[in-house]
Amino acid sequence: MSNFIPLNCKTHYSLQKGFCKNNLLASKCSEYGYKACGIADLESLSGAVDFHQQCKKNDIKPIIGCDFDDYLLFAKNKKGWFDLINYVSEPTLDNLKNFAANGNLICVSNKSNGFKKLFKKNHFQYDHKKHQVYYVTEDESDCHRIMLCSGMKTTIKKVNKLISDGKEVKNKEFFESSNFFLPKPEDVAGDFEILNQISEMCEEYEVAEKPMLPTFECPEGFEEDDYLTELCRKGWKKRLMSSNKIDTEEKKNEYGDRVKHELKVIFKAELSGYFLIVQDIINFVKRKDWLAGPGRGSAAGCLISYLLGITDVDPIEYDLIFERFYNEGRNTEDHISLPDIDMDVPAEYRDDVIDYIKEKYGEENVAQMITFGRLQGRAAVKEVLRINEAVSFSEMNAITESIPDEARISDQLELMDEKSIIKWTLENEPENLKNWCIMNEKGDLSGPLSHLFEQAIKIEGTNKSQGKHPAGVIISKHRLAAVCPMTTDKSGDPVAAFDMGDLETQGHVKFDVLGIDLLSKIMEIVNDA
């Protein structure tokens, strides 16, 4: 059997270049008998945390790397993981020299080009462009080409015409060959001792961390739990006693028991700091005489939020349940779930609020976060039809309008093993698509466009673009570029390059600051009155 190890896999976080999905990549590696697998996305670590978690589920050793075109870098250990994060955030020559000297990164390049001198025994000269994996199974090659065409803003027919005319075409190799899939070990000829050496040099380490809340500066003599309790006492007097809400012994006991229960849960989860940070931000907004939202979503079910002035809704008065907001049953020894309180502020003052947070916790410790635009349902079908030039524009619109918005069927999708809007439509509203595609009880597709619907189903969930989350702000106790890969938005402001779920896995704490136009309009009306 071959000693090949797939170390240069490109996931769909290599936007519109790679197509590997981490869950399928890890499960296929397990099925094929691989003991290790590596990813090296294009100047990105955005998919690394999810890849690591998927490999662990499948008993595969995860090897995390990054592709800088002329060379690959792999993390040898946890220190190397943080060195790689630092370098991806700031890929300068000085940083490369410094991190090479640390000895925790492995460099792979086709030519020496000075890398051997920098990395010494941690450098391997190897053609890293060979045996790249851009999609997991051979039948995904068409989907990969769809994503390439999407990035190139062209169609399959136009690319094939250019190739047949002998013209130069970007990504030409992927249109001429379907050999960029994950091979079985026995199908790869050659000696891959270098790949095995790299794999053996890379240790296994954890990327998941417990929540790393920034330290809230309490008044002298107070710890966070004590200060939260003190603020609850003040809120009790201000919001309950002054309004006669606890004018009977029964009511006093009801409110008292609720506060004690909520504090007990919050103390156990070590989340006092979270509430102190949120109330401090809301207090800043109110000191500026800006409107703050009265409380939206499940946060209105927390009495402590009401006592602290974070929300203006009394959960007991409206029979709102604390466990809808925070359920300690979701916590495990290895994972503490985080609360989610939306802080609504006038849209034009959102940047001022974020500037206040940066001033308080440090410019380098605060950033907004990335979000990925994924092809779902209608968008996936439309992309496939457009790039294949399969139907007229009007028919394409008729097809996509027959597929429901994700929001309308979100509850039903949660019950599906494979959350596919297209499959849900074919199964639950078959009349909508019967002229183009039909799905039988076994899940097989038929109809004039069935092969294109198969492509669209495979493409669902694929990253197409990246942007900035409209609300999420990360506040860290560390310099973010040292613990989280960073990118920038169009204005050059720092953006954390892990998505929301991966940031939480890594222990980063998200605070939602939403700019609400309606609050701006209300302020305008009040000020003009």
Regions inferred by a protein language model and the residue ranges of each:
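Alpha-helical scaffold/interaction cores of sigma-54-like transcription cofactors
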Residues: 1-529
